[in-house]
Amino acid sequence: MQKKEIIILCGPTASGKSYLGHALAKACDGEIINIDSMQVYKEIPIITASPPESYKSEIPYHLYNFLPITEDFSVVKYLKLAAEKINQVTASGKLPILIGGTGLYINSLVFGYNNIPDISEDLRQQVRKLHNEIGNTELHNRLTKLDPLASSKINQSDTQRLIRAYEVVLQTGKSIFSFQTLPKEQILSEFNFKIIFLNPERKFLYKICDERLANIFKDGAIDEIALIKKQFNPDYLNLKAVGIKEILAYLENKLTLSEALNLAQTRTRRYAKRQITWFKHQIKEKITLDYSNEEDFLQVTRKLSILIDLPNSNK
């Protein structure tokens, strides 16, 4: 039996995935499913550069900006939701087009994942209360006694990973890293994945990264993060999107606005570089689209339906 098709449009931040994916979905009767770990959160659409409402009014978008930032989210939870949406889209006769740059999600979807048990809400609250009382250093010391492997791999300044490892060892009695040795579970084995990798020339990409982040800062990101800071304790939130840390520092008068923007731009460029390296080495079978300027990118947009052998409505 011929496998059903899924398109994954991936690449570094600011590479044009949203624009290109939207054009592709319109041309090929597709629906878009998020595969970015930060764009799931509903309180931070601006800083995460989530698709605009104008896009969402034209075609269906799934798994964007739906989850409260107070809710814990994992790759396993993502995969279950993504599989559900993919099956719904294909059942309706549409083409699922997954867009994003989170390597862990893409790798787990395509090649399988390590199923780490969910943490009970009671235990989660207990660990967060404990961390609030004793801090990172002491929690890291306690993790060393329970799980020396995890403590050796996790820096005590990495609050999220530290708490996660401590929760897992308390819940399961096993190191979080022990689950990586188990056979991987496949969630969508009946599908064929066609992976498209956007690979802009480095200098051009860095220019776009800088410009986009400057616009994001101007277009409401500061107010967005200020509201979160007012309502929640950022230490316990999964706020890893580039720019959030710098805006928080600005709001706490630790950086000027210019310093915050410059630092965030530097981090964005480094993040983009890491993403490119990851995709080049981890995803072997893919269609790579190279471009070095805006005209090249527009040409890629026009030709994409033909390149991946899908019907084109000539839009």
Swiss-Prot record:
Belongs to the IPP transferase family. InterPro entries: Dimethylallyltransferase, IPT, P-loop_NTPase. ATP binds at G11, P12, T13, A14, S15, G16, K17, S18. The record marks T102, R124 as: Interaction with substrate tRNA. PANTHER family: TRNA DIMETHYLALLYLTRANSFERASE (PTHR11088:SF60). Monomer. GO terms for biological process: tRNA modification. Keywords: ATP-binding, Magnesium, Nucleotide-binding, Transferase, tRNA processing. Its EC number is 2.5.1.75. It catalyses: adenosine(37) in tRNA + dimethylallyl diphosphate = N(6)-dimethylallyladenosine(37) in tRNA + diphosphate. Residues 36-39, 160-164 are annotated as: Interaction with substrate tRNA. One of its GO terms (molecular function) is tRNA dimethylallyltransferase activity. This is tRNA dimethylallyltransferase. The gene is miaA. Substrate binds at T13, A14, S15, G16, K17, S18. Its cofactor is Mg(2+). Catalyzes the transfer of a dimethylallyl group onto the adenine at position 37 in tRNAs that read codons beginning with uridine, leading to the formation of N6-(dimethylallyl)adenosine (i(6)A). It comes from Rickettsia bellii (strain OSU 85-389). The keyword Iron does not apply.
